[in-house]
Amino acid sequence: MNIVHQLTWRHLKANKRRTLVTICGTIVSVAMITAVLIIMASFMQTFQKTVAAETGDWQVRFVEVRADQVPKVAQDENTAAYTVAHFEGWAQLKGSADPRRQAMLLTGYTPESFAQLPMTMIEGVYPRNDHELLVSQNFIDTARLDWQVGETISLSKGGYLLTDDGTDTWLDKADGRVAQAKWQFKEERTYTIVGIAKMSSELEGNWQDGYLGLCGMELNALSADE
C-alpha cells in the first residue's frame, strides 16, 4: 500500500461521519442516475410503440417504386421486413350517409403486409386477392351501408381527374380535392367483404374526403412499370 492509500485510509477513519455521508451520497447519486436512465429507456419504448400503433410498424418508406424495383429493396441487407402497397383506384359509394365521403380509395397490399399496418382486426380475415375487401369500423358506423362480412357487393370503379390551370391530375389520395375532381368510370367490379378493422387516424382519418378499402394483391400480377 503506497503513501497515498495510507493517507486516504487514515483520513477516512478519522472522519467517519464525513465518510459515511460521502458513501450515502454516492449511493443516492448512482441510484438517481440509474433511475433517470431507466425512465428514459422506458419512455422511448413507450413512444416507439405509440408511433408504431398510429403509423405502422416501419422505419423507412419508399414512394413511386416500380414493381420491378421491389426485389432490390427486399433483398437489401438492411431490410428486415417490408410491405408493398399499390393504388387500385376509386369506388363510388352510392347511398353513403356521410355527404363528404361518397367514395372509397382502394389500395392493394401483399398478404404479408397487413400485419404491419396500424389497425386492429375486429371481424373476419385479411384479404387474399383483389376481389376481397377489408373496410374500417369507422366506415361501417358512418357510411351506414349495412355491409356485412361475407357479403358480395358491386362497386363502380374508376378514378377522379382534377384539372387545375390546364394541368390534369389523377387523384390517388383522399386529401380534400375529390369534390373538385371529375369522376371517370372504368368498370363495375364485384368484391367480397372479408374483414372489418379498427384503423388508426393515420391510415384512415376523419378529415379525409374518402374512405379506405384494402384489397389483397400479388406482386407478380403487376406490370414492371406499375
Report the location of each language-model feature.
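Charged, alpha-helix-enriched surfaces in structured cytosolic catalytic cores
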Residues: 3-7, 38, 188
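N-terminal Sec/SRP start-transfer signal
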Residues: 1-31, 44
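Basic-flanked hydrophobic alpha-helices used for secretion and membrane insertion
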Residues: 41, 45-226
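Transmembrane alpha-helix boundary/anchor motif
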Residues: 34, 38-42
